[in-house]
Amino acid sequence: MSVSYDRHEGMSIFRPPLCFELTGRQFRLVMDDGYDADLIFLDRETLLFRRAGEEKRCPYDCIKMEEQCYFINFEERPFKEPRCGVTVVLDEREGLVTVCFATLGKNPKLPRMPYTEFVFGAVEQPDGSVNPLRHGYTAEMAGTSIDWNYGTFNIAHVYQSERFYRVAFTPRALERIRRNSPEMMAGSDGRPAIRRVYEDYADFIKIRDGLFAVNLLETNLCRRNGHGNSLFFLMNLKEMHDCGRSFGTNAEGLDENYTFGAFGTRYDAGREMSLESMYYIH
């Protein structure tokens, strides 16, 4: 059983096909936090994850974004409390790995806002060696923006700086919203809600040239509406195609953890970048 449920297909129209190349293989992950892990792909649907004396058997999605580079997302089912989702970016060519741990319920004031932690590491080779290099945080994407097409809607992500992102809507996206979801055009104060510039925390990690892992949080949305998610992407900016996963809850309060994908085009977000932040002191 795939991690993704049928009800999420609208976000997954452009998701790359699931990859089964790792079936039957196992990897020893040497992690910088001192807790090494074993990642074992039992079959096309289930993996085993051993770490810090714990063993989890989980359904998973694996997506191949470049040759020998995989986006692997999993969480125990049925969901256990407190929830912990794991996403692994595995670069077999370079022997490097980045793991994103997403937990729910860590913040007592915002129990429906995920907390994310990144751990970097390397894949142990058959001779016992490990690559001394690591994936790392980067400023390469700062000052750029991309209009992402998810098939049913468009949204532009503005990578404001090394630590923040903003949301913008192109004229094409606004027209699609007017046509398909007119209720999104009006805010509670009478102003067009969709035209406000939303800003929040972000992490940008370089995996390879042109390939970036990006984590976008929705903390301000959670403060306003009671729930927000962690959106974690692996972006291939040479082909302008990404995959990702959404971890947290939906508007109905139901748990969710699913993978998706989009195609992107460069977008001039000079206006959105020039506006003073409504949320943070820069």
Locations of regions flagged by a protein language model:
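N-terminal glycine/threonine-rich, aromatic-flanked beta-hairpin/loop signature
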Residues: L29-I63, F153-A202
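Short, solvent-exposed coil/turn segments at beta-strand boundaries
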Residues: F20-Q26, I40-L47, K64-Q68, V88-L96, ...
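Surface-exposed beta-loop interaction hotspot
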Residues: V99-Y150
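Trp/Gly-enriched beta-strand/coil motifs that build multi-repeat beta-propeller-like domains
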Residues: V130-G136, G270-H282
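Short solvent-exposed loop/turn micro-motifs enriched in small/polar/acidic residues
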Residues: F20, D32, G53-K56, E81-P82, ...
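Long compositionally biased, domain-poor regions of proteins
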Residues: P59, F74-D91, T98-A102, V158, ...
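Hydrophobic, helix-prone linear segments
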Residues: M1-T46, R50, R271, M278-I281
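Extended, charged low-complexity segments
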Residues: T219, M235-S277
